[in-house]
């Protein structure tokens, strides 16, 4: 019984192959990722060739590509893309302010004045900067007295106290 079934399957396969013989082709086979189109030319098959790992060639564009952090808008101009440029590591440019920034340990209050911030100034290890003085510093061996004048200081300049 098995022999009869096996002979029947073989006879069926032979009959099918005889009914649809392969045409004899004069053209050589196409390369990998190519197929023969209706005109007989080898054409690239981007969809069936290698799946996602195969890169499809980009279409040729008349416009050159935009620089990093820029994209081409609908009118064809390169426009800066602040949000899509490098993620969180990329700093967005700060808005231009008319007021200059406050010094260290100071902050700008609601009226626009720089106010000293004792609590937010780095703790005990942070030295508070000295206030800016209009008077220039005194020369070596001199110090500024209570009236703001530079006075010679003999003891602060290597003299021996009695």
Curated annotation (Swiss-Prot):
Q: What GO cellular-component annotations does this UniProt entry give?
A: extracellular region; nematocyst
Record has Signal as a keyword = yes
CDD domains on file: Ugr_9a-1-like (cd21873)
Tell me which positions the record assigns to the signal sequence.
Answer: 1-19
In the record, what terms sit under GO molecular function?
Answer: ion channel regulator activity; toxin activity
Disulfide bond positions: 30-42, 33-49, 66-78, 69-85, 102-114, 105-121, 138-150, 141-157
Q: Which UniProt keywords apply?
A: Cleavage on pair of basic residues, Disulfide bond, Ion channel impairing toxin, Nematocyst, Neurotoxin, Proton-gated sodium channel impairing toxin, Secreted, Signal, Toxin
List the subcellular locations.
Secreted; Nematocyst
Propeptide residues according to the Swiss-Prot or TrEMBL record: 20-23, 56-59, 92-95, 128-131
Q: Which residues fall in a coiled-coil region?
A: none
Free-text note on domains in this protein's UniProt record: Pi-AnmTX Ugr 9a-1, AnmTX Ugr 9a-2 and AnmTX Ugr 9a-3 have a structural fold called the boundless beta-hairpin since its beta-hairpin is not stabilized by disulfide bonds.
The UniProt similarity line reads: Belongs to the sea anemone BBH family.
Tell me the protein's name. Precursor protein UG
Originating species: Urticina grebelnyi
């Amino acid at each position: 019984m098995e022999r009869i079934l096996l002979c029947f399957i073989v006879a069926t396969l032979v009959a099918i192959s005889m009914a649809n013989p392969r045409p004899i082709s004069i053209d050589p086979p196409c390369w990998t990722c190519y197929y023969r189109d209706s005109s007989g030319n080898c054409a690239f098959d981007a969809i069936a060739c290698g799946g996602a790992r195969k890169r499809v060639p980009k279409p040729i564009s008349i416009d050159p590509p935009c620089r990093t952090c820029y994209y081409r808008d609908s009118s064809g101009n390169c426009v800066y893309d602040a949000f899509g440029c490098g993620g969180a590591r990329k700093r967005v440019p700060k808005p231009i302010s008319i007021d200059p920034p406050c010094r260290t340990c100071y902050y700008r209050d609601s009226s626009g004045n720089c106010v000293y911030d004792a609590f937010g100034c780095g703790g005990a290890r942070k030295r508070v900067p000295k206030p800016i003085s209009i008077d220039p510093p005194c020369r070596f061996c001199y110090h500024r007295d209570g009236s703001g004048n530079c006075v010679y200081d003999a003891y602060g300049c290597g003299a021996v106290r009695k």
